[in-house]
């Protein structure tokens, strides 16, 4: 770490653009520009922002059956996903390079190399040099997410070294997996990213716990989603009728390494949460607790992580 001045970071609570990938990419570009002009050096967007998190949709499924209309809607969702690399990725590379920022964006990724049907919930890392530096695929989709997303493997437990410290993180309820969190801590993450689709109040306790446990800064980031944001011509839109008008109230927030609130949670609107991080607070906070250092017991506990890529056919 060579830069000891405060580091401004931004967590973007963007309004959802379901089934409208081009608009989502343009939102990434415009809100990145806004955050960069405010001095942000690291900018985080929510889980599944580009490609969409389909709140409230069941895609016409029930135990033991699927519907033709559900298949059509999944086809439309698949078309909303992006290839990595691909033209949408190139556009986000460009905006990161134009503004010289570290940019992290949640996307829905198509796997066109090994499968033409499987989607992944992915976090992309872009550098200020305008390059895609890496990606993380969600290891375990939650509940009905398993219907539409595949599972990532250990090869994308990505972290990125910046000039102000190592950045990495996990997506949504992966953050309830203790061994996954420990893997991030073991990689030396100082700024921990936790993009999510969970807008419950209690999610704030999770973010605060991660900050205290890892003695790291934590950026929690969610979308603001209203039923009216879905396209009018969406088939099976009646599946949304059982849900409230506001599908995700947000809750984007930033916490410090002693669990202190640095960026208050933002609710019921789109916006950007900022914080200025004193990176020296990391080692000061670890004076009495260092989860992979003096508070670890490798003689009692060990964690083995398989970071190899897994394919159905070798």
Predicted features, each with a name:
Residues 21, 33-128, 198-200, 204-216:
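Cys-nucleophile CN-hydrolase/nitrilase-fold catalytic domain and related Cys-dependent amidase chemistry
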Residues 1-42:
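N-terminal glycine-/serine-/threonine-rich phosphate-binding loop
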Residues 51, 58, 124, 136-140, ...:
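Short beta->alpha transition motifs characteristic of CBS
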Residues 105-107, 121-125, 158, 220, ...:
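Short beta-strand scaffold segments in enzyme catalytic cores
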Residues 81-94, 99, 109-190, 195-209, ...:
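Active-site catalytic loop in hydrolytic enzyme cores
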Residues 223-314:
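C-terminal beta-strand edge segments of enzyme domains
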Residues 10-12, 44, 104, 134, ...:
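Hydrophobic/aromatic beta-strand patches that form the interior of the parallel beta-sheet core
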Residues 93-94, 100-113, 221-224, 229-243:
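Short, basic/aromatic recognition patches
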